[in-house]
Design a protein with these regions (language model features):
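Carbohydrate-active catalytic/glycan-binding domains of CAZyme proteins
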Residues: 1-321
């Protein structure tokens, strides 16, 4: 059995979330009082682990990643995950974007990330990090017909682990056992719907779901669509809306999501970001660099389709313990 190592949390008060009344008590809730985008929510060792782009810097210029840890999606601790200054191949271009984490068969964790339009991999003994970067990217800029960003991960029912990525075209490839390389000849691609970026996969009851973001991250109409298939090779159904902006509530640019199952249940959670409001409730603007992450339940209908997620202002409180 793998022992999860928990390091000391960072002392940082500015990521506390909005107060909300639950069972006659005021508690913190989501979204957090911190600009965070491109969420990757995972569950390890009975806790939520949320990896994201630390946002709020012009032109997406952040250079380090944090991991946020919670028992209930409401009260969070923050830990350092990876600093691009420790990445040997990073040339200083662009910033630290769109992380995604997978647990290997040996119990270790691989942290995928974007830097300089390349996808890197870093390994850690614990989901808390820190993660030690590999000497070369796992996906080099220009190798595939897409903008090399937005890694995602998927573990199929047979245990095969996959890496997903791409802007403009979606790519998927089965990973080697160490999750640090893949056979480029086995990578497949497609362009679902009006695909822009952030491809994600999940499987339930023999149905595969591909979901992705459409439009530009700076566009108020940034949104999530999905399609269904009986296998990863398709054929995929016609795209349907999954998360659309709620214009009547001024909740815009609802995209770049991921989906996670609560182990031992048929409960599913979707994490996504949208244009942020600052702690005083003022809109932070639609430059695409000031975004907030929210969490919501994801419902699978009896016919296998997904119930459209309605963006809300309130909270989603779901304890694991």
């Amino acid at each position: 059995m793998t022992t999860v190592i928990q390091p000391p949390a960072l002392r940082d008060r500015d990521f506390r979330s909005l107060p909300h009344r639950v069972n006659n008590a005021w508690i913190d809730t989501n979204p957090l009082h911190r600009y965070c985008a491109d969420p990757n929510l995972a569950i390890y060792d009975g806790r939520y682990f949320w990896y994201c782009t630390d946002d709020g810097v012009d032109e997406w210029g952040t250079t380090a990643f944090s991991v946020y840890v919670s028992d209930d999606l409401v009260t969070w601790e923050r830990y350092p995950a990876l600093d691009l200054r420790d990445v040997p191949w990073w040339n200083g271009e662009d910033g630290a974007w769109a992380p995604s984490v997978i647990q290997r068969a040996d119990g270790r964790y691989v942290f995928y990330f974007v830097a300089g339009s390349q996808i890197g991999a870093a390994v850690g003994a614990s989901p808390y990090g820190p993660f030690i970067p590999e000497p070369e990217p796992i996906v080099h800029k220009g190798t595939f017909d897409c903008h090399t960003i937005d890694p995602g991960t998927f573990i199929d029912t047979d245990g095969t682990r996959y890496l997903l990525w791409g802007n403009g075209r979606a790519w998927i490839a089965p990973l080697a056992e160490d999750c640090l390389s893949f056979d480029e000849t086995r990578a497949i691609s497609w362009i679902p719907g009006d695909f822009r970026e952030a491809i994600w996969l999940h499987e339930r009851n023999g149905i595969y779901y591909a979901s992705w973001s459409e439009n530009d991250a700076r566009d108020e109409g940034y949104c999530v669509k999905y399609a269904m298939a009986q296998s990863l090779q398709g054929t995929w159904s016609e795209p349907k809306p999954l998360i659309m902006p709620a214009v009547d509530r001024a909740l815009y640019a609802t995209g770049h999501h991921n989906i996670v199952n609560i182990p031992g249940t048929d409960e599913w959670i979707v994490a996504y970001h949208r244009f942020a409001y600052d702690p005083s409730g003022r809109w932070a603007g639609g430059d695409g660099c000031h975004r907030e992450t929210v969490f919501a339940p994801l419902v699978h209908n009896v016919d296998g389709t997904l119930e459209q997620v309605r963006p809300e202002v309130g909270s989603y409180y779901r304890p694991l313990r």
